[in-house]
Amino acid sequence: MKYNGDKVEGIKIAYIGGGSRGWAWRLMSDLALEQSLSGTVYLYDIDYEAAKTNEIIGNNLKSQWEYKSVDSMEEALKGADFVIISILPGTFNEMMSDVHTPEKFGIYQSVGDTTGPGGLFRALRTIPLYVEFANKIKKYCPEAWVINYTNPMALCVKTLYETFPKIKAFGCCHEVFSTQNLIAKAAKEIEGIECSREDIRTNVLGINHFTWIDKATYKNIDLIPVYKKFVEKYFESGYEDRGDWKESYFNSANKVKFDLFNKYGIIAAAGDRHLAEFIPFFGYLENPEAVAKWKFHLTPVSWRIKNREELIKKSKKMAKGEEKFEIEPSGEEGVKQMKALLGLGDLITNVNLPNRGQMEGVEFNTVVETNAFFTKDRVQPIISGKLPDTVNMLLSPHVLNQKMIFEAAIKKDKELVFHAFLNDPFVRKLTYSDAKKLFNEMFDNAREYLKGW
């Protein structure tokens, strides 16, 4: 890697999960648009053919980046300046169990990748992989900056740091961005203020997918009262800022978000599908009819399987030149973060990092999501303060479970992970006997990934 004026050339990016048909394509697009950076992206994936296809797609863009698929993680990592991780831990068969087995016991999960029974078992598959990633990063590129996109985000980042304490890693999630966009729309509709999400200053604090905003300003204007008026206007009907909520599993009318604002007076800053899973006792996920009433969706794994098949077809067409790869800004910030870390301009954005005091009221080393300051070769968390006690209480079981699930996965302690399972708000509605039955069934479904337990 070398600097040439205001450009950086010869950058090496290692991509673990380089066969991705989502995050990898977004990265390709953003890199092609950023003229100040150039280099090589090494694509590693357990599905080598998927990585090879992405190599062809990336090189067809004829950008300032070269893409190389490799069949060993070591080759990808050796001497890397940046490491990007976006993987599916296990297969959709396991995710089918994560999401749908609990439905036999009346537990409905809208995503199933972060919290709840599904999030827990996904974590048990993920943590051993991240121990391996951290150890190989330590060996082959200890000074690289590591960007994680995989869920469960908090436990992925925690595993990287617990395994390799000197790692330079952070986790990125776009959920807060959509809430900032919503605040900008509220400012326009209520006060006639034209602004983008980047123009708004927000204080972000919480844990991934259960993040909150307690301060939002545009110039000297406090936007919390503006958002309050917006919520009052749209609470009953909802506000469909991304189109008809019925048209996509990923759309909602923000009614969960609005309800939480009415209950707690601060802005819940994630999508309704994610927020609802942390607080199932509010009834948002009581049954499919309740979900429809709150105007969001349960996302069936069958849809993910069908969508994957469509993306595979799309990737083959793009590799053959039969379909055009659209180069457009993805809305993600990974490339902006790289630029800042390379010294090409500072950046403030929200990321997931171990708590070193940036968030009060949460145990040290818990992975929290707050704003951070990015500058050359440094990410400095920004003091975010403390959530109201009433909101912090909602976080508590999830913060404790983050610690217990990690410890159980490292020790392969089935009894401890069952206690974490019992502590999850979803599971508390069950009798002990039913909780044990559900746990054992899900454990058996995941046994291929739980050898030695």
Swiss-Prot record:
Protein name: Alpha-galacturonidase
Organism listed in the record: Thermoanaerobacter italicus (strain DSM 9252 / Ab9)
Cofactor requirements of the protein: NAD(+); Mn(2+)
Assembly description: Homotetramer.
Lineage, highest ranks first: Bacteria, Bacillati, Bacillota, Clostridia, Thermoanaerobacterales
GO BP term, example: carbohydrate metabolic process
Catalyses which reaction(s): [(1->4)-alpha-D-galacturonosyl](n) + H2O = alpha-D-galacturonate + [(1->4)-alpha-D-galacturonosyl](n-1)
Annotated function: Alpha-galacturonidase able to catalyze the hydrolysis of the chromogenic substrate p-nitrophenyl-alpha-D-galacturonic acid (pNPalphaGalUA). It is probable that alpha-1,4-di-galacturonate (GalUA(2)) is the naturally occurring substrate.
Comment on bound cofactor: Binds 1 Mn(2+) ion per subunit.
Annotated binding of Mn(2+), by residue: 173, 209
Record-linked InterPro entries: GH4_Enzyme_sf (IPR053715), Glyco_hydro_4 (IPR001088), Glyco_hydro_4_C (IPR022616), Lactate_DH/Glyco_Ohase_4_C (IPR015955), NAD(P)-bd_dom_sf (IPR036291)
Family to which this protein belongs: Belongs to the glycosyl hydrolase 4 family.
Binding site for NAD(+): 11-72
Catalytic-site annotation from UniProt: 174 (proton donor)
UniProt key word NAD: yes
Broad class of enzyme this protein falls into: hydrolase
Gene Ontology molecular-function annotations: galacturan 1,4-alpha-galacturonidase activity; metal ion binding; oxidoreductase activity, acting on the CH-OH group of donors, NAD or NADP as acceptor
EC number annotated for this UniProt entry: 3.2.1.67
Protein keywords: Carbohydrate metabolism, Glycosidase, Hydrolase, Manganese, Metal-binding, NAD
